[in-house]
Structures are given as structure tokens and as C-alpha cells.
Amino acid sequence: MNKTLLSTIGLCLAATAAMAQNPFVQTWFTSDPAPMVHDGTMYVYTGHDEDNADFFWMQEWRVYSTKDMVNWQDHGSPLALESFSWADDRAWASQTIERNGKFYWYICAHSKISKGMAIGVAVSDSPTGPFRDAIGKPLFENGSWDHIDPTVMIDDDGQAWLMWGNPQCYYLKLNEDMISYSGELGRLDMTEEAFGSPAMNKRERGKKYKDSYTEGPWIRKVDATKYKVDPSKAYQLLYAAGGVPEHISYSTAPHPTGPWTYAGEIMPLSDTKSFTNHCGVADYKGHSYFFYHTGKLPNGGGFGRSVAVEEFKYNADGSFPTILPTDDGVKPIATFDPYRKVEAETMAFSKGIKTEQNDEVGVYVTDIHNGDYIKLQNVAFGNKIPRVFTARVASGLRGGQIEIRLDSIHGRLLGTVNVPGTGGWEKWQTITLDLDYSTLTDLNAPSRTISGLNLPATADVYFVFTGRKGPKLFNFDWWELRAMEQINMPLFQTKYTADPSPMVVGDTLFLYTSHDASPEDIPDANEKNSAGFFMYDWLLWSTTDMVNWTEHGAVASLKEFPWRSRENGAWAIQTVERNGKYYLYAPLHGHGIGVLVADSPYGPFKDPLGEPLVWQKEHWEDIDPSVFIDDNGQAWMYWGNPHIYFIKLNEDMISTSGDIYVVNQQDGVARPVKEEGAKINLRVPWSQKATWAVQHYQEGPWFYKRNDHYYLGFASTCCPEALGYAMSDSPTGPWKEKGYIMRPTERDRGNHPGICDFQGHSYVFGQNYDLMHLETFQHHERRSVSAQEITYNADGTIQEIPYWLDQKPMKQLHWLNPYQRVEAETMNWGFGLKSAKMGIENTGVVKDMPESTGKKNMYIFDVNDGEYIRLRGVDFGKGAKAFTITAAATGTATVTLRLDSQDGPVIGTAVIKSTGSVEKYKPFSARVKNATGVHDLYICFDKTQGDVRLDWWQFK
């Protein structure tokens, strides 16, 4: 397409794109549309006019498809002249039909054999190909020019009919194999009664045509179950009529062979900028559509045509109304789902771009320049929250940007994908963008609110391409938008968490975390929006299925160590069990490492020493303790940043034995720290290959043993930090770095591993900023813990995994039983909600948190409209009948129970009313219907007023 011409009309296109849908393919000149509906999809098979052509020099056929009638996917060219050894020119009009699971594409082309036009047939197992010549020769030819524009129909009795021709209309009876025929070539009687009288005002040179039929027939049968059709008019033959310029007329008959009776015009002559026309008709999802072609693309015309479509309604007797060509086209009949992998060549409108295809990726978008764009219409965000956008791109130059905008090319910016140079136009890279929700506020109605974020239920989406003016920017293969429900989001949402420390006891996995304070929890008003660490206590969570987690609140705080020197700095801990006791090892920043002991994993934890367990007073490197008890009973503690230290623990777990050792990171060998030259540390970025034994260590060691291999997981060279690991045959080394568990990414900053086996699966835990990024991309130390399953190779090495958000949600180990009491703070997702322990107001952790809280009951508060608690994999069995939720409230709230999504089927509704006090809990019940089998459960909140607090719920 002429880029100069496109740029001159760009403003006009931008102004009208919101309305104009015709022509519905803008990337290429397309002609002779032939629709086919199959398996819920509308396919349109077209010809392809070459750019800047002075005749119908056509080399291939193309396929497009849609499920909503406005967003069309380009499937490229699965059939070309080269597919037919006997053809050499003129890939003209065609039609495809399905029979017995095969797809038959009837074409016309110029024959090398007869030197005339011929009818051929290709076959495929798929509507989009690849297609091959079914018989290796023309299906019909006799050297005449007449044999063009085939149309095909399978009648109710199974007889297939093939028709074609200009100016004579021919027909054949196809055999059931669809690639052979029986009987002689038939000819329709081209009488005035059959096809109307010639329009003499278009016949300046006399009576060249005997009647109004010209070419491009389309045969169909009226559905007698829908329309009161006269049996003598059961069959309809549409065609281009009147010579040049052409309009569309039709005739009717009681049988495909006639006799035919002229029925009138369907699409009269109009200024379509094309002197030919060619139609096809199809019913789809309760609508009727008329396809035709125009010359209305920029630089188009009689030899540069473009397919278009109009919706219409048949008359009561099945006859056609008058259909006029429009620029508006048709309205969408369905919304477009963006939460999946979408080919970039799927679009409702585009400016400037082209499509190409190759064997590696298939069809892709190319010829992208600054200011070009793709539009998708009626995109449904629904009740999901879009989180991650991924694009597959390639660039042989410097790349460019993809701006994701709503409703216009200058509309609200959702995010910008920076496309780098990839080293070649077909050297593809996958680029990921985490969406910034600060851009999603103040959107116009209709809208929905999720945790204070306004998002449109549906919108048009524009991919606007920007970069250097002049050169081609990049190629674009596919994109994917993933909602939070589709990706591996952080495990917890009621609080910011970091430094995960898993501990397995029986069938329960306990996860201890540090706690990044929210602004309201920071005592100093001047520090509430600071970017630094504000950490005062440690939290506990538990699960039995790896997807639904129960919060147990703070199990310990800095106040448990009265000898500490700081009020801030509750950094990474680890808890281990031995002989029925639970030992929590905690760094006291600048004051060594302490230990707490409890009789329960829930606490209360107490300091048995009154002083540090380990304290190297000459530096501040005593952080991030990791403790492991070996098979022989020997306990070890590793720690340190930027050096790796370890020491033996005695059996009492609260005293040490022997010297502190430090790992020489050049050779991986541990030496007593007091030895001169023991410390050798040279950290290099992960982008630089390690030449030393453990060259990328930064902090956060996680020491464990599995199948006789010792492992040291760690956070890599900052920043951003990866999850790396080293291995050894001994708990003391020598250590050898093995590579990544998870590579570093600019989407993150710090990290901290926790690794364990649980119920036959292996997991790695780490941290990120993905929860905070739902509210802001301005940096704060407000982290969140995520987890993912990992796989060990036969030699003990660990298979690398992608970034958290680039993975699917974790698999559930077993279903949740709703017929037992379930704490309200048990959830898979609850963004926007908050939690606290009963009797402890959430007005400041440092001020109000007792020194030891133990296992006290918790509640959910700060409940607002649009928020919800999601539980995954709830097994209702044969059916639930009732639901009870206990709450305390000074206001009211409606609790709607839904299955599988926020707008899923409603199974019950409970109304929480005021209990007179936020400390007075009462049960509120609802009848439940249609809750059987396994579903995700959404406990949705609406019509909330006042302070509402939730304790537990249960089905019966």
C-alpha cells in the first residue's frame, strides 16, 4: 500500500475509524468474498489483487475468520497458483465448502494446458489449510474464457452442485467425493425471464449481453423452516449483473437447474469505486450477512478491490431486501476476549501495516512505521483485572514502541511496550509489560470498580506504533493479555510480605514471612511514603493445598528481643522444628542473630537467651539466617550479605559449636573466618558468566538437603536479584554455583528464596513487588511473596522457571471442604481486604502489638463494594443447602455467593445487618441452590455500609 498516500489521509482515517468497518480488511487488496460458517466461526475466502495493478493479475487466495463479525484474523494464503501445476495466471474468484470433515476449495485459474480459464479444486483437513490440489489437474476446462467464478452448494438430499461462468452460467453435478462429477456439462437458459432484460443505458456499444447476468454466481437454498418460501422460489442464484459497472441481482427457481425467474436487484449500482462486484451470503449466530467488494481502500479501485460486509434481514418469504453499501459495516455480535494468546494479525481496523507469513511463525504483522496502528473492537475486560501484557516481536533495526490505548489512537494509555532491536526481522523475542494501574483511573462510564480501580467493562483497544520516523520499526507476531486469575499472583493480599520461610509439619505447610509495613502502619508520619524498609514483626501463613492460605497474623516482633538496638529491621527469618519445639532465627540488624522458641508453630515465641546467638560486631553482615538439621542430627546455620557464613548449632538449637566459617567464593571452600584471607568475594552481574565457584551470591541463603545433595539457594547479585543456587556433596562445601532457578528481571528488584518438598511436589518461594504494582509503580519496599513448583533433573540440578507472573497459577493439591468451619482469612485471593487479630486494632503494629500474640483468632475488615474472597477448588459434592457467615458490624453488607468468577452463577445471598458492635459476632445465613461438584467460590461484597468484620463461614 502506498505509504505516502496513507500518511496524507491519516487524519481522516483516524477521525472515521471509530465508525468505519468497511472494507474490513485493510492490509491487502482483497476481492470476491466467499463466506463459510464452520464450528462457530465465520470464514471468508478471498482473492488478492496485487498492489498498483493494471489488470486482475492475481497470484493467490486468502482466508480470514471472525467470531464477532468485526475483529478478523488473517490466516494468510494457504492456496496459490503454485499449488496447481497446471495453472499459470489469474487466481480469480473461488468458494470453499465442507463435507465429511474435509474442506473443498473450488477455484478458477488460467490453464497451461488449454490456454483458457479452468475450474480446479483443492482439499484440506482444516478450513485454514494447508490446501493441496485434490486431483492434480483441472476439474473442468475446454479452452474457453467462460470458466470463472465457481460457486458450490450441497442440497438437502446430499447432491452437490457446482456452478460458474461469464457470460454463460454453467453447472455440474458433483459426486459425493466432491472432486469428480457425473453427467454432462449443463447450461442455464440465459433468458430475459430468467435473468432480466439488459440495461440499455449501460450498453453504449449495442447488445453485447443477451441479459443482465454477467458473472460471479452464488447458489443457495432458502431455509423453509424459517421463511414462508414459495417452493417454486426455493433456490436463489445471486450474481453480478449488467456488465460494467456491475450491480448485484438474483433469480429464483424450484431446482438448481431451473427454470429460473428474475427476482430483482439486491445491491444497486453505487459509488463503490469498483466497476466489478462479487457477492456471497451467509447466516451466522442468528444474523444474515451480505459480502461484496469495493475499491475504497486508499490507492484502490477496479483492480485494487476490498471486501466488505452488510447485515440484512430477509423478507418474510425469504426474498432479499435492497442492500446498500456502507462505510459503517456491521455491529459486533459478541465481545472480544483479550485474555488469551491473540495473533497480531487479528484486527477490526488498521492503518499502514501489512501481513506476511513464513514457516516458523505463520502470519505476522509487518511494514510497521511510526503512527501506524491496529484497532480491536468491543474488547471485554469484564470482571477480570488485566495484569500482564506480552508481545512477540522482531526488529532488524532499533525497534520502537507499542502504545496500548483505549477507544482511540489518542485515548487513555494503558501501557507502553518497548520493543528492542532483536538482531533481525525474523529473530523473535517475547517482551512482557506489567500494567500500571495508576493509568486506569477516571475512565468514563460504563465502568466497574474493583478495589478502587475503575476499568471499562468493554472498550476498543488500539495498538499505536511509535518510533523513529521513516524506517520500518519491527514485526509483530502475537500478543497476550493475562488477568490476575490467569497468572501466578502473590500468595497474600491483606499484607505486604517478604523473605518466605517454608516449614512442613505433617500435612500442613507453614510459611513464615517478614512484613513490610503499609503506610498506615508506619508510626512516623514523615516516613509513611518513604521508599525504605519498615519492618517490625513476622507473620505466619499455612496451607494444605498450596492455593488456599490461612493467615495467622504476627507470631513474633522485634519486641521479643529487648536487647535489640533498633525499632525497625525485622528482616528475613527461618523457623525449624526439633523435638517438638519450634526455633525461630531472626536477624537484629546491626546486633547479630537471635533465636526465639515456642511449643507450637503458631507461637507464642520467647527469647531463651536474652542476647544474640551470633554477633560479629565488626560488621553488619549478620542477616538472613537459614537453619538445616542434617540426617545425622547435626544442625547448621548459614547466613550473610555479601559473604556466606555458617556455624554448627548444638542439639539444643540455641547455642553454637566451633568457629564461624566463611565460604571463599573463588574456590567454594569454607575456611574459619578468623583465618587471614578467608574472605574472598567478587560479585558480578548475572549477565556475566561466573568464573569463580560462587560468584553471583548476594544474600538470602537457603540451606537444605535433598537426595544426598546439599543445596544453597540464594539471591543473586543486586540489583535486580535472581534466584540462584549452588550444590555440594557436603554441608560445608566446597560449593559450586549451578545457575538460575529464576533469572533476574527489571520487573523485580530484590529476591529471597525458600525451598521445600510438600506432598510429593517441590516448591520455590520468593518475593517481588507485584502486589504493590496493582496500586503504584513508584518504588517502595512493599513486597509480596509468590511460589511456584520446581522440577529437579536426574543429576539433582534444578530446572529454570520463568518469572512469577509469566506462569499459570499453581496446581491445587486437593479440594477444599466447605462443610467445615473455614476462617474468613482463608483465601486464594482477597485484594483490598485487610486482616487483624481479634482484640488488636490495626492502628499501628509497633504501638499495639503485644510482645507475643500466639494463635489468636483473626478477622477480615475494611470490606468495600466490589471486593471479594476467592477460594479455589471448593468441593460441594452432591450439593450444599445452606451457608452461614459470622460477622460483627455497625453497618450492613450483602454477601453474594458465586461460582467460578465474580459474575458467575449465584448460588446464594446473605445480608449482614448491624450487630451493634464490631466486637459482637453473629451468624447470618443464606439458602443455597445449584452448588454441586467442584468450583471456585467467590464470596462477593456489595451494598456495604459502616464497619463490617468477618470471622468464619461454613456450608451445610
Language-model regions, residue ranges each:
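Bacterial Sec-dependent N-terminal signal peptides
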Residues: 1-21
